[in-house]
Amino acid sequence: MKIVTTVQEMQHITKELRASGKSIGFVPTMGYLHEGHATLLRKAREENEIVVLSVFVNPLQFGPNEDLDRYPRDIDRDENVAKENGVDYLFYPSVEEMYPVEQTTTVEVVKRTDVLCGKQRPGHFAGVATVLMKLFNITLPTHAYFGMKDAQQVAVIEGFVADFNIPVTIVPVDIVREEDGLAKSSRNVYLSQEERKEAPHLYRSLCMAKERIEAGERNAEIITTLVKEYIETYTKGTVDYADLYAYPSLQVVDQIEGRIILAIAVKFENVRLIDNITLTVK
């Protein structure tokens, strides 16, 4: 595995690889890698001749009062996970390397961002889309891999890639969970011992909702109310949202049909956790 820290070198490498006809699987991350990231890397390894991993904590996607400065970082751990999962190139640029001068251009996302995390975090998806536009142009991937834990992000990225005719296939990958159902996340380290015991109830609330839908419930408001009440009963967390939308359009639905997403965000004392399920309802 080769570690690359400059845009110029990474772009030179990937240009040569693409010119020689190689397929490139790209996994963009903010580091502090866990089994969810490893799953993305393994899928990229299975489906491509070359695997490129980026580790970059992107300041553009953090709001003024968010956790940019304390976001967990451990490059030694990340290198080990990368090597264990067959990464060929680890792209590890500094903020100064990615943004040597103030951006004169950013990508504004105008659809799919006024609900869920986009509603709570204005400007977040513009930051995500801007850094991905840069990373796609630097790594020149044929395929890019994203976890469905942030399903709204996947929907936004699919739309932005289609809108700009970017020649990359977006590959969504299922959420990876702990044995008790908690979605794996770099931010889980912020949970207190008691909160960690409560956190699996997020997924249990989604499973309960899925059972009700499969049993015939089609009223979206009834389902989201059930989820909120369950989480408020079994955790001390504050429900930021528990919403149900058509997917990937993220249009509001009153009656549940077609492909839908049920997504939640819950604030604990030092961390905000998200989770979701997607299902197709006939």
UniProtKB/Swiss-Prot annotation:
PANTHER family assigned to the protein according to its UniProt record, in alphabetical order: CYTIDYLATE KINASE/PANTOATE-BETA-ALANINE LIGASE, PANTOATE--BETA-ALANINE LIGASE
Presence of the UniProt keyword Transport in the record: no
Reaction equations catalysed: (R)-pantoate + beta-alanine + ATP = (R)-pantothenate + AMP + diphosphate + H(+)
GO molecular function list: ATP binding; pantoate-beta-alanine ligase activity
Gene3D superfamilies: HUPs (3.40.50.620), Pantoate-beta-alanine ligase, C-terminal domain (3.30.1300.10)
Any one GO CC term of the record: cytosol
Tree of life domain: Bacteria
Residue positions binding (R)-pantoate: Q61, Q153
UniProt name for this protein: Pantothenate synthetase
Family to which the UniProt record says this protein belongs: Belongs to the pantothenate synthetase family.
Catalytic residue positions: H37
Misc. comment: The reaction proceeds by a bi uni uni bi ping pong mechanism.
Organism of origin: Bacillus thuringiensis (strain Al Hakam)
